[in-house]
Each structure stands twice: as structure tokens, then as C-alpha cells.
Amino acid sequence: NTSDPYPASTSPEMLAELVDLLRARGLRRIKVGDCSWNGALPTRNVARQAGITGAVAGKAKMVFFDEGSWVTVPLPGTFLKKVTVPEIALNVDRIIFLANLKTHFLADFTFGLKLAVGFMHPLERSLLHQERLREKVVEINLAVPADLTIIDGRTAFVSGGPARGRAEKAGLVLAGTNPLAVDVEAYRQLYNLKKQHQLEESFSADPFQMIQLSHARECGLGGETWPGYTCVDL
């Protein structure tokens, strides 16, 4: 996250609702983790400015990855052979990604899979952006796979992004346990929204013409059953 308001960064209100939902189901040892990019550190200050710290006060423990221990783990990736991630991320029961619905001027878009960059050590992120960014962000997920991905798409960036962009109402929230299926559906929704505003740009009607999603499928992040997903209105 940066200190920019939603949808550039996590909505404090949505985060608070998620924590309340988890607590209502009897969960108490809830940790909210984040790590900003090099130019915005320390994350503690960003979280306070963005309203994240206040949103979970008394409900969950804030964990600022840049203040903790890191572990370098090997990856079976094509473009990333190792990644340095927070030690705490490897020692939790479940990982929930709370992502937004928005375009990204370098990675095309940022949903759940792209959120995994937040687990990467800040000093490694500059190298990440030098080449093969779209493929590399996907491969980070091999180290810290999400058990549940939530896309807060009430408002979306339909151009620009990630910190500044054209915001339009999308009016949706997506959630699922299959990271590829969630991001594919998020892409379809964003593509339709961009088309509505005549902003298709380099986006394709076929999600798998986009490098992030095609590479995620190649990496097996959706398993073998992801094509059978269905959308259920709640």
C-alpha cells in the first residue's frame, strides 16, 4: 500500500468489515500484514496515514513486514528462482489477500496475484521491475499462495494505476479460494468496464492473451479444476 486513497490502496472500511467477519466466526489471532515499496517506507507510517491502523485497532494485530525477519526461499519458477519473504508469512494458518480492481501502467492490471509483491523484500522489488514483471509477480505466489482471495471492486481504476488513475464505479466484490479463477473473473469485469468507457487500450477480450493470467495457468496456480468455477451472487 501507499497512503493514496482507495482504490489506489486498501479501503480501511472494507478491511474493518473483513476483520469483523472473521471475528464473528470465532477467529481471534488475526494479523494484518503489509510492506510498502522502497520510496514509501516505513510501512508503519503509511498504514497510519491511510487509516489502516485505526481500522483494525483493538481487533487485529498489525504486522509491518519491513520491521520483521525475512527468509529467502527457493522457487520452481521460470524467471524467479528464489524470493525473500517475511518469515511470519510462512508460519500462519491461512493467508487472505484483500486486493483491489485496477489497471497498472507496468503490469497491465493488479488483482490478487499481483498483491503477492507485497510479500517480496523491498530491495528485491527494483530488480523485479527490470524485465518480465508480469511473469515474476505471478511466480511470487508459488512461495506465498493465498487461501482466499477477495477483490474489492466497488470502485475501479479503468486507466492509469496503481497510485493514480481514472476511477469508475464497478459495484462488485469478488471472493474465492482459487487464485486464478478469481483473477480471471476480475479481469473479465475490468475489461467490460474499460470497454464501457472506450478504454480497452491493450486489453484483450480473451483473459489468456494477457501475460499475467496465461503464465499463472502455466505455473499451475489454478490447479486442474479452475475452469469449472461459477459465479454466485450473494
Question: Could you describe each region identified by the protein language model?
Answer:
Residues 1-234:
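N-terminal and secondary-structure boundary signal
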